[in-house]
A protein has these predicted regions:
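N-terminal Lys/Arg-rich, disordered targeting/topogenic segments
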Residues: 1-6, 210-212
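Extracellular ligand-binding interfaces
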Residues: 58-96, 100-139
Length: 212
């Protein structure tokens, strides 16, 4: 009976090694794309104040004399229904966007939608959920996209007082964080190589038995 070229444990190790190499290559390619856009001046890295953004069903307390803000800070906003929107009407290469919004009540879902060139309508297919990276700080990872517009839904319940100061586009971050997988990618890197190794081992065993 012929012996397999690689044992199951060796296949598993090889699969994880290949996954690690592919991940590093993916990150390096992403860095190259980012640097290309940055050198061309097509990658905005800026803070956009609330006053520079277009809002819908999301208004400052100062816009209505009958509204009473939680305190005297002029940055308090109120969502007037369960589908408020914040729009950034620009274009550029976006890797991450950060929403500065301290909610006084639970906001429900906080999400970002983006448009690609030629698109006019936002859709669920281009939706990114926020990660809370600090109190009142919601980070959206777009993975590097050329966008022609952004829409952020700051809450999904309505009637939420929110201390809103604006958004940050492509904020500076340490270079090494580009090589750290997100939670979703950790799951992929943990399970896909194991499944691939198991399938490869099963296929090898099948052909070895067939030839014996």
């Amino acid at each position: 009976m012929r012996k397999p070229l690689l044992k199951a444990r060796q296949l598993l190790l090889l699969a994880y090694l290949l996954a690690a190499v592919l991940w590093v290559v993916r990150c390096l390619v992403g860095c190259g794309v980012m640097l290309n856009y940055k050198l061309q001046g097509k990658m905005p890295q800026t803070h956009v104040d609330a006053a520079e953004l277009v809002t819908e069903s999301f208004a400052p307390y100062s816009s209505n004399e009958w509204w009473t803000p939680p305190d005297d800070d002029p940055a308090w906003y109120l969502s007037t229904d369960s589908d408020p929107h914040i729009y950034w009407q620009g274009q550029g290469y976006i890797e991450t966007a950060v929403l500065d919004a301290a909610h006084r009540l639970p906001p429900g879902g906080v999400a970002l939608y983006y448009l690609k060139p030629g698109q006019t309508d936002y859709s669920e297919a281009q939706k990114v959920y926020a990660r809370v990276t600090a109190p009142g700080v919601y980070t959206f990872d777009l993975g590097g996209q050329w966008v022609t517009g952004l829409r952020i839904d700051p809450d999904s319940v309505g009637g939420v007082p929110t201390l809103f100061t604006g958004i940050d586009l492509n904020p500076a971050r340490p270079w090494y964080t580009r090589f750290v997988p997100t939670a979703g990618w950790w799951l992929v890197l943990a399970f896909v190589p194991a499944v691939a190794a198991a399938m490869a081992s099963a296929v090898c065993s099948f052909f070895i038995k067939k030839d014996s």
